[in-house]
Amino acid sequence: MTTLKGGPTDRDDDDAAAVDYVARARELAPVIAAHADDIERRRELPAGLREKLIDGGFFRLLLPRSLGGAELPPLPFVEVIEEIAKADASTAWCLNQVSGCSMTAAYLAPAAARAVFGAPDGILAWGPGPGEARVVDGGYRVTARFSFASGSHDASWLGAHLPVVECDGKPRLHADGSSVVHTFLFPKSAAQMTDIWHVVGLKGTGSDQYSVEDLFVPARFCVARDDPGARREHGLLYDFSALQLYASGFAAVAMGIARATLDAFVELARDKIPRGAKRTLRDNNVVQSQVAQAEAKLGAARAFLFGALAEITAAVARTRHLSLDQRMTIRLAATFAIHQAMAVVDTAYHAAGATAIFTANPFERRFRDIHTVSQQLQGRQQHFETVGQYLLGLAPDGLAWL
C-alpha cells in the first residue's frame, strides 16, 4: 500500500481512493495509545508520532488529490477520526481540526495552495479571535489575536478569519449590509505564539493562542472560504463546507471516546468485585441494564450520524448542492452524538467506582476529555434550539454554525 507523503504526485485519483484509511487508523491506533500519557504530559503530539501521522497521510485526509491529499468523502473521514479517538482523543481532535482547515486549499490558486500544502509537513491550523485585515497595495495588513488553535503545534502555516477593512478604514460590506469576512493564511513563523493551554481535558491538542501585528499578507493567500463561486476544486467533498466536517468529525471524537470507555468498563466488570459485594460487576443487574442502555445510546447516535452522512452524500452526488434541510440534519446528528457519548462515558465512569479515579486506568482522562469536547461550540445545547425552530417552521437562529 502506497504511503502518502503529502506532496503532489502523479498517482491516479483511483489510487488515493483505494487506500483504506480506516484500516490504516486501526493499525496505528496501538502506537497512538502507547503515546497517550506522553501526549497529555507534553500538551502536544510527540515528534515521532507526528511523523507517523504525516507518513500515513492523516493530516491530508480532506486535502484535494491534486495536492497529494486523500480527499475522503465525509463518512470514511469521520470513521477514521472515530478510530483515532478510541486510542487518544487529543490526537483525533487535532487531525479533525487541521483536516477542516486544509479544505481551504480548494479555494486557493494552485501556486498558493502548493506553497502552503506542498511539503509533507504542510499543515494549516487556526482559531477564532478579534482583529481586522486592512486593504493595501498587493494584499492586506492583518492585526489580530486568536485562541483555541488546536493543532497549531503541528502546523507550519496559520490562518485567520477576519472582516475586511478598506484603505479609508471603512468596513467592506456585502449588499445586505453584513461584513465581508475572508480567510488569510501566513507562515507560522510570522506569528507570536503564547502558551495558554492549561486545561482539564484534551490537553494534548496544544490549542494555544497566536497573534500578528500589522502583518502583510499577499492577496494570493486570501480566500473567500466556503464561497462556492470561489472554488477551484470541484470534487464531491467540496460541495460540503468545513463546517459540516468539523461538526461530524468532533462528534466522531466524542463517539470514539465513548466507545473506548464503554469497552474498558465491560472488561473491568468481568473481574471487579466492589467492596462489600459478593459478585462481580457484570453479575449486577443494575450494571447489566446500564451497559445495555449505554450501548443503545451510542449505537443510536452513531447510526444517526453515519446514516445521515451516507444518505446526504449520495444525494449531493446527484444534485451537487447541500440543502438547508441536509445541513440541519448534520447539525442535529452531530450535536446529538456528542451528548449521547457524554452520557455513555458518565455511566461507565460512575459504574467503575473508585477504579475510575486513578490515572493508571483508562477512565479519568476520557472522562475529562469528553467533558471538554462537550464544552466546545459543537456541543452547544443551542444547536438543538436552532434545529427545533427550523422543524417548527420558525426562522432559525444559529445559521452561522450550519
Positions of predicted regions on the chain:
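FAD-binding subdomain of flavoenzyme oxidoreductases
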Residues: 139-214
